[in-house]
């Protein structure tokens, strides 16, 4: 595209912008709120009349409900808003508010000179006084559930999917997770992740408030189901965009909001559970809520040894997440949250505190195959480990709104880790483990203490012109104290007939500090078009030392060739431009958001060791374009959404990977650097379409996604077939690493009474990974390319009538593996199939029975012991007393003693099958008590 074409396009854009501004600048929207003068509660359906100064009518409207949200604070009480479109010129007006249960009220408003690009202006808040003959229940938001003969389970209200909690048969004594598992189209995973129609929930909130964000298990495992009125699913706009009046679909969070019943939203409630069982199993848990007009307090805690962690960090690995079935976990936790909200939403503050202690014992057995260009090697290993981590976190969130808007967070964390492990490993050139290459056993112990913190402040100002500016600053620090590990390792090289024993101690202190700041200006070109240029600056400082010691016959001596000290400084200079266009169409909405971001990054590392002392400086230009399209159409019959997104994510190599020197503290795994490493670029693409119909509870969605990595970094290695030593060197693979996938999710009611619901989630995926593993003395340097095709299908059908709920479900998983280098016979097809029934029934005399029966079948695993059929059976019987205040529950876990935990992983360098110990079957008897203090009626 030449320069003349660009100039012509820009002039055309300016001309169109000017015409649009001229057309729209004559009018402006005025909005305001109406509330009860005594309770300050919002009043719906108030008739508001706009009058001129001479009392002649201009326009008439009615108020409607609007909810406000604050990140980290939550959903504020609803407000009743009115809107008028008035002339963009100075003038005086009178607003008249009428309601059958209130006295008529008046408010004056003076329209002053405003900027041409200002789209709306706030009018007066009108307070009404209750009339003498007002209906008892009018004038506030009682918001009670309407009970019908057949309760509606789910309904769309605008862009919000609402589930009625009282319409589901949830077993007595259940927490929030028991309710969510019954919602049509909703999947709850063991790690606390929630998917609605195949799309992952970004944030699980309580009455709109962030509640230990990223740790869904805290609420899922502690909030009693009977406190819940509705569960709402919607896209929540960011707090800053709400203040600025910006509608940005790309930045919205997919949110599941748990709305409490009124008696638990104002007043207090508590739930305590305690019990014991076979094999010395025990459980103690408590959860308390206290609400008032301006405060909310939550206190929770518990301890158990039945693998209930009550916490989940979204950044942990997938394997650790599934600790519910694997390992033997003793867990303790205590935490709380306190929220204060000042009048008229001017100031809100939230404080969260949480402390955990764990004691986990694991046994594992694995069988792996490592791909080489000339064949494969095979390994067997067994090991045990015991870890005792503990943590403490304190977080505060503050929001203040006035002429400026301030939002800030501050967080402090302390983590303590203690771990012991031991085990053995053997590597062979053949699958039957007869041609051994090497073997080893180990015993290790490690400890570390880490203190970290972070802070964020965001300040914004909306100008009279309708534009706005924002300034934000953030910083963080972390420091490790006393990080030390000791290990004893014994190696046997069978083909050489030699042995090696090492007793090693490692000290690895580290610290990290960084800060950044950004300023942006939001310029409204027209009512539909906005541009936002921004610039930012930030620095980081990272220190990481490693001091290795080897023990001789007397004491530990410094291993100088494997010890080093390094310090890295990073400088980031960022610039970005957002161009956002949105338009309301007939019964629909269309938006396109584009971002072009550049980071001019400078990295400098000073590296010091006995064999090598050097400094490295690198400069990168990191481009991050992002394009997002959104379209929504809704009528009285159905709602449709479509999203398309593309973005590019560049990453730079670790500076330590650029140091070309060997690290041989582990004699079987030697690590080199590569000074020629390049930055990697990951291209992501997603497209989704969803449709819903209230008449049949239909929810359907289809999602396509793909990724392509250019210059992917991989740890290529050379393998010594005589000793089994791997010499690693990071390499860039220019192509051959990509993924593509499709997910189809749908659910609907089968009959008019909606007693039957059916659903299915089908996902297909293909992953291509490319790596480099070369055997020594080999002349063939062909890359290893592995294709991994996966299919997963989860059908289910549910029946609910009266006190009975039954569900049949399945989970069919299939994996096909293909390598470009095929030597000998290799298993290429793996099946994991599960199917079964679960249900609950409310028996006479306040008894409830709940059971889950699933058959798990595995085929295609290399280890023949893993190819089996196992029948899992859990059951519970509950009895409630004194109108549900007391509850006795007998739970049986793995009644048939069949639960087994397996994990299968594969990439371009090999595949691994891992078995981990599972908690043994047990029976547990618990008693729980729930207390509720309802607000006094005035």
List where the protein language model places each region.
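Outer-membrane beta-barrel translocator domains and adjoining extracellular loop/strand segments
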Residues: 244-246, 301, 310-317, 361-378, ...
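Short, ordered, surface-exposed loop/turn motifs in non-cytosolic proteins
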Residues: 39-64, 156
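Short Pro-Gly-centered beta-turn/loop motif in secreted/extracellular proteins
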Residues: 71-79, 83-92
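Outer membrane beta-barrel strand-and-loop segments of large Gram-negative receptors
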Residues: 382, 559-566, 672, 678, ...
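Membrane-proximal, glycine/serine-rich, low-complexity loop/turn segments characteristic
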Residues: 21-27, 49-55, 89-91, 96, ...
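Structural motif
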Residues: 25, 33-44, 55, 151
């Amino acid at each position: 595209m030449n320069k003349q074409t660009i100039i012509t396009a820009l002039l055309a854009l300016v001309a169109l912008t000017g015409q649009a501004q001229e057309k729209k600048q004559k009018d402006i929207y005025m909005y305001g709120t109406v509330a009860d003068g005594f309770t300050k509660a919002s009043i719906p359906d108030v008739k508001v009349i706009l009058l001129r100064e001479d009392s002649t009518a201009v326009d008439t409207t009615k108020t409607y409900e609007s909810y406000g949200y604050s990140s980290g604070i939550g959903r504020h009480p609803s407000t009743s808003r009115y809107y008028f479109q008035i002339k963009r010129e100075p003038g005086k007006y009178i607003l008249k508010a009428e309601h059958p249960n209130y006295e008529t009220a008046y408010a004056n408003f003076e329209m002053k000179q405003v900027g041409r690009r200002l789209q709306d202006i706030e009018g007066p808040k009108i307070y009404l006084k209750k009339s003498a003959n007002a209906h008892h229940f009018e004038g506030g938001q009682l918001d009670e559930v309407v009970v019908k003969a057949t309760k509606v389970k789910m309904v769309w209200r605008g862009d919000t999917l609402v589930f009625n909690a009282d319409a589901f048969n949830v077993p007595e004594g259940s927490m929030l997770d028991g309710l969510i598992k019954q919602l049509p189209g909703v999947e709850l995973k063991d790690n606390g992740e929630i998917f609605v129609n195949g799309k992952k929930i970004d944030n699980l909130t309580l009455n709109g408030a962030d509640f230990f964000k990223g740790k869904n298990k805290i609420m899922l495992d502690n909030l009693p189901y009977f406190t819940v009125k509705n569960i709402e699913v919607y896209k929540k706009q960011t707090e800053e965009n709400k203040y600025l009046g910006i509608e940005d679909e790309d930045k919205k969070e997919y949110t599941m909001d748990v709305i409490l019943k009124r008696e638990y939203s104002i007043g207090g409630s508590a739930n305590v559970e305690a019990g014991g069982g076979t094999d010395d199993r025990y459980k103690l848990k408590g959860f308390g809520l206290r609400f008032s007009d301006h405060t909310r307090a939550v206190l929770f805690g518990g301890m158990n040894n039945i693998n209930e962690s009550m916490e989940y960090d979204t950044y942990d690995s997938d394997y650790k997440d599934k600790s519910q079935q694997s390992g033997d976990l003793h867990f303790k936790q205590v935490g709380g949250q306190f929220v204060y909200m000042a009048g008229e939403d001017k100031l809100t503050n939230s404080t969260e505190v949480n402390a955990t202690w764990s004691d986990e014992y694991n046994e594992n057995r694995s069988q792996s195959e490592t791909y080489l260009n000339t064949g494969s090697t095979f390994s067997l290993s067994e090991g045990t480990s015991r870890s005792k981590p503990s943590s403490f976190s304190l977080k505060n969130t503050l929001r203040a709104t006035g002429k400026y808007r301030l939002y800030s967070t501050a967080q402090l964390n302390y983590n303590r880790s203690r771990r012991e492990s031991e085990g053995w490993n053997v590597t062979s050139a053949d699958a039957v483990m007869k041609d051994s290459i090497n073997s080893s056993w180990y015993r290790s112990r490690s400890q570390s203490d880490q203190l970290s913190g972070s802070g964020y402040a965001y300040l914004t100002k909306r100008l009279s012109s309708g534009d706005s500016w924002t300034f934000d600053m953030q910083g963080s620090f972390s420091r490790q104290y006393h990080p030390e590990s000791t290990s004893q390792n014994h190696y046997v090289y069978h083909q050489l007939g030699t042995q090696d024993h090492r007793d090693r101690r490692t000290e690895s202190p580290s610290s990290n500090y960084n800060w950044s700041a950004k300023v942006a200006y939001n310029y409204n070109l027209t009512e539909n078009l906005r541009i936002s240029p921004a610039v930012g600056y930030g620095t980081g400082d990272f220190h990481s030392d490693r001091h290795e010691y080897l023990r001789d016959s007397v004491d530990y001596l410094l291993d100088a060739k494997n010890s080093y000290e390094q310090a890295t400084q990073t400088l980031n200079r960022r610039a970005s431009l957002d161009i956002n266009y949105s338009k309301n169409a007939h019964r629909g909405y269309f938006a396109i958001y584009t971002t072009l971001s550049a980071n001019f990054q400078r990295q400098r590392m000073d590296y010091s060791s006995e064999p090598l002392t050097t400094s490295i400086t690198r400069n990168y230009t990191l481009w991050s374009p992002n394009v997002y399209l959104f379209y929504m159409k809704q009528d009285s019959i159905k709602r449709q959404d479509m999203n398309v997104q593309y973005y590019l994510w560049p990453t730079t190599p670790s500076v330590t990977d650029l140091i070309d020197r060997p690290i041989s503290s582990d004699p079987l795994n030697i690590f080199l650097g590569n000074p020629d490493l390049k930055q990697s670029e990951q291209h992501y693409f997603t497209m989704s379409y969803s449709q819903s119909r209230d008449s049949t509870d239909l929810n359907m969605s289809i999602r396509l996604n793909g990724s392509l990595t250019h210059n992917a970094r991989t740890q290529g290695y050379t393998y010594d077939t005589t000793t089994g030593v791997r010499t690693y060197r990071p390499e860039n693979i220019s192509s051959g690493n990509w993924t593509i996938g499709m997910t189809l999710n749908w659910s609907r009611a089968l009959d008019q009474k909606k007693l039957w619901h059916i659903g299915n989630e089908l996902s297909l995926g293909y992953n291509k990974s490319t790596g480099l593993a070369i055997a020594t003395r080999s002349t063939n340097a062909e890359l290893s390319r592995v294709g991994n095709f996966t299919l997963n299908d989860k059908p289910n059908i549910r029946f609910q009538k009266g006190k009975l709920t039954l569900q049949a479900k399945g989970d069919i998983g299939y994996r096909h593996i293909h390598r470009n280098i095929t030597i000998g016979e290799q298993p290429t097809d793996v099946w994991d199939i599960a199917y079964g029934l679960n249900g609950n029934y409310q028996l006479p005399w306040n008894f409830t029975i709940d059971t889950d029966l699933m058959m798990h079948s595995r085929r295609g695993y290399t280890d023949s012991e893993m190819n089996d059929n196992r029948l899992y059976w859990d059951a519970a019987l509950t009895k409630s007393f004194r109108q549900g205040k007391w509850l006795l529950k007998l739970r049986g876990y793995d009644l048939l003693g069949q639960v087994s935990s397996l994990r299968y992983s594969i990439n371009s360098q090999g595949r691994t099958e891992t078995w981990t110990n599972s908690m043994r079957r047990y029976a547990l008897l618990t008693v729980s008590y729930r207390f509720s203090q309802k607000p006094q009626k005035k």
